[in-house]
Amino acid sequence: FMNHHMDKATEERLRAEAWVGDAILALYVREWILAEEGAINGKLFVEFTSNDFLRRTGNATGVEAEIGRTFKAGGLEAAYAWIEHHLKPRMEERWHTLRRKALR
């Protein structure tokens, strides 16, 4: 998702796309947590928006930039579809793992 050899203009564009993508991911994760948990859960929010979590898919900035680009090209619905395809399966897997640990 990210090339380490880029010029300054490309790097700035990537950062701007990632900044928007980060906000969209935050909204998606908050809505998902409320639907799954029925309550605010800041610990889960941090878990699913952290760079460590995003690195399971690729470079964290690159993942957020891809979400931002998808939003710019197709709106919120397209960005959510990207998240559901690329991140939601990992979110659900991790959520179930955390729930099992909590029940022990």
Describe the predicted segments one by one.
Residues 1-104:
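RNase III-family endoribonuclease catalytic core
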